[in-house]
Amino acid sequence: MTLESFWEKVTESNLRQGDYLVNCPVPVYSEIPQENSWLEIQIGFSDLIIITQSCDLENGKNDLVALCPIYTLAEFEEENPKASQKGFWEQVRKAKIEGFHLLSPFQNPENNRECLVVDFREIYSLPFEFLTKHAASLENRWRLKPPYLEHFSQAFARFFMRVGLPANIPPFK
């Protein structure tokens, strides 16, 4: 069975959950400001994927849009050497490592070394109008297709709704 792409190309400027926004400007804070003082903020650039629900985006319910960074495996491994250990990505693929979600590459879904990884542990919140203008400037961009979009959304929900217990029921022997 041939694996189809998880993605479709879109040219419209409207935003939806699962939209991949390349080279998006994000604030980078270097220090905590003192009261009544100015703070210089650096601007970084990151590839991001929208996690805000499409219905909220379409109905204008949000002034801010939630996004997570998305990386190629090589980019992620460069910053996180532990990720290059044997078996790491297989555990992520099986949803055994919290906070990460794998998505197929845009062009060659059969090659899992070209996969993309979403890091749910880092969430940005950027203005809706700003992102709409950024999306319009991209001309073509990628958007997750169903049912991969729903799978992605559910993975984020599972990560976000975790509850850590102080103690657990002991294992059965």
Report the location of each language-model feature.
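A structural micro-motif recognizing beta-strand termini
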Residues: 10, 24-26
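Short, charged beta-turn/beta-strand-edge "cap" motif at the junction between a beta-strand
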Residues: 26-30, 55
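C-terminal terminal-subdomain/extension
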Residues: 1-14, 32, 36-42, 80-173
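Compact nucleic-acid interaction/catalytic patches
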Residues: 52-93
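A generic structural signal for residues embedded in beta-strands
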Residues: 21-24, 50
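Short, hydrophobic, well-ordered secondary-structure elements
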Residues: 40-58
